[in-house]
């Protein structure tokens, strides 16, 4: 998505067409096209489920992803396979990585069984994964006929991807790498920070930030100075002073106005914060979706309009019926997918009385939370609280996200949750550099005020900002 948006922006700004930029793409996309692969060649969610059944490891993989890591979920099979992908990305022996990770929840013998079944499945079925594409590109050692090479976010490239880059570097006269080793937070996908730092002796530091105000800059600078082995660099904040505010409790954060983004280390911690927002009736966005489903909100508005005497089109009525129970909201046989609606013209309007006589409506007049029975009690309570606050339900002012997902983003008000997962805290105590970089990224997302919340974890597992 990021590559597509960047390509569209460049074409618009420079008056180009997309076919003039055939190599403006991710490394995986480049390797995919160079290898002549088809989408059906790529190992799928169903394939992983089949492999998991054979070895007794459940998967919760996603149906789509831009990398092998993106595809994986959080089930046992995903955790095992993630370790194998990481070893390949880092170009190190699997047993060596297994010893380094020291994750005693992973059985070595079962890991070997999974890897054997995985590779055998790909071989027999003629399947590949995203890492195979890069490995094949490297094996063929066939550079592109290009004059210039621009590599963005280069600090996140894995050791294997740097091997692909070394092939791409064979022909172009102009070579530019952009990135920030202080923001190298993709170590869990094999990011090779040293390779980025050593990719060229000719370095230029962009010294002026156009986002980070002065007060948050002080926090950011303090964190980055803790990173051992970082490339020395001096940069300056904007002229705006901004502010840093500390909060002991979640409920103290003044969310009433303005744009907000809440950042946490893991999805589990994000979910805990999202539940707090929900309890307070705040509408928020997560994964690009509002916390109140738009169709449910449309059904509520449509019903309220119907109650006030307005007439509705067929699509609006079908949407209302989708949240009603049969024989309570509408007569059996008149559901939203019934024949009753098949041949109805979409632009014809029906009053509530007409719907009772022609479309099977049987719900008596009442408020939406009394008639839309398929919206559960807790959700009704949440929506009622949210509507009282009067926020824009379809375009929430508040976003919740992991720090990794927000990389590259910005917001006026950034809330940073310092809590760490047990695994991240264990790694933090052993090697803090990863968490320094992660929380440096978090605090530099703000354009105005940085809000720092006291730890919620009762066992002392948090990052010390």
Spans of features found by a protein language model:
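Short, polar/flexible loop-turn hinges at active-site or ligand-entry regions and domain interfaces
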Residues: 13-21, 36-50, 59, 144, ...
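Conserved beta-strand -> loop -> alpha-helix junction used to position metal-binding or nucleic-acid-contacting
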Residues: 19-35, 282-308
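P-loop NTPase Walker
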Residues: 1-40, 221, 406, 444
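Accessory N-terminal region flanking or inserted into the helicase ATPase core
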Residues: 61-150, 159-164, 187
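Conserved helicase motor core of SF1/SF2 NTP-dependent helicases
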Residues: 4-5, 25, 148, 155-241, ...
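Conserved helicase C-terminal RecA-like lobe
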Residues: 304-453
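Conserved interdomain hinge at the start of the Helicase C-terminal
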Residues: 243-258
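Conserved phosphoryl-transfer catalytic core
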Residues: 31, 42-68, 171-184, 200-209
């Amino acid at each position: 998505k990021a590559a597509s948006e960047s390509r569209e922006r460049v074409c618009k700004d420079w008056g180009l067409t997309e076919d003039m930029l055939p190599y403006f793409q991710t490394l995986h996309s480049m390797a995919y096209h160079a290898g002549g692969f088809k989408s059906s060649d790529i190992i799928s969610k169903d394939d992983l489920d089949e492999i998991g059944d054979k070895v007794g490891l459940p998967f919760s993989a996603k149906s789509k992803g831009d990398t092998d890591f993106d595809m994986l979920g959080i089930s046992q099979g995903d955790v095992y396979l993630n370790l194998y992908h990481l070893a390949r990305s880092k170009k190190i022996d699997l047993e060596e990585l297994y010893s380094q990770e020291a994750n005693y929840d992973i059985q070595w013998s079962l890991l070997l069984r999974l890897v054997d079944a995985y590779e055998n499945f790909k071989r027999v079925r003629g399947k590949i994964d995203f890492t195979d594409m890069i490995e094949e590109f490297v094996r063929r050692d066939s550079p592109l006929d290009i004059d210039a090479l621009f590599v963005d976010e280069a600090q996140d490239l894995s050791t294997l991807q740097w091997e692909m880059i070394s092939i791409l570097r064979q022909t172009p006269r102009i070579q530019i790498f952009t990135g920030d080793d202080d923001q190298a937070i993709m170590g869990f996908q094999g990011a090779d920070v040293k390779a980025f730092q050593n990719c060229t002796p000719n370095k230029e530091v962009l010294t002026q930030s156009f986002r980070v105000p002065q007060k948050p800059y002080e926090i950011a600078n303090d964190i980055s100075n803790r990173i051992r082995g970082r490339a020395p660099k001096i940069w300056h904040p904007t002229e705006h002073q901004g502010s840093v505010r500390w909060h002991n409790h979640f409920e103290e954060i003044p969310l009433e106005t303005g744009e907000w983004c809440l950042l946490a280390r893991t999805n589990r911690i994000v979910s805990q914060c999202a539940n707090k927002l929900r309890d307070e009736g705040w509408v928020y966005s997560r994964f690009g979706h509002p916390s109140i489903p738009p169709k449910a909100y449309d059904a509520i508005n449509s019903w309220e309009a119907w109650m006030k005497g307005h007439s509705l089109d067929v699509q609006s009525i079908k949407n209302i019926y989708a949240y009603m129970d049969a024989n309570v909201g509408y007569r059996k046989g008149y559901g939203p997918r019934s024949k009753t609606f098949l041949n109805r013209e979409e632009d014809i309007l029906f009053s509530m009385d007409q719907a009772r006589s022609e479309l099977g409506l049987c719900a008596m007049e009442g408020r939406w939370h009394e008639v839309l029975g398929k919206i559960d009690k807790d959700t009704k309570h949440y929506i009622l609280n949210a509507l009282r606050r009067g926020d824009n339900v379809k375009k929430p002012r508040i976003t919740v996200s992991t720090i990794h997902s927000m990389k590259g983003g910005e917001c006026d008000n950034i809330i940073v949750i310092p809590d760490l997962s047990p695994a991240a805290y264990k790694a933090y105590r052993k090697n803090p550099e990863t968490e320094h970089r992660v929380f440096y990224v978090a605090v530099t997302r703000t354009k105005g005020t940085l809000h720092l919340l006291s730890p919620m974890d009762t066992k002392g597992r948090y990052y010390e900002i």
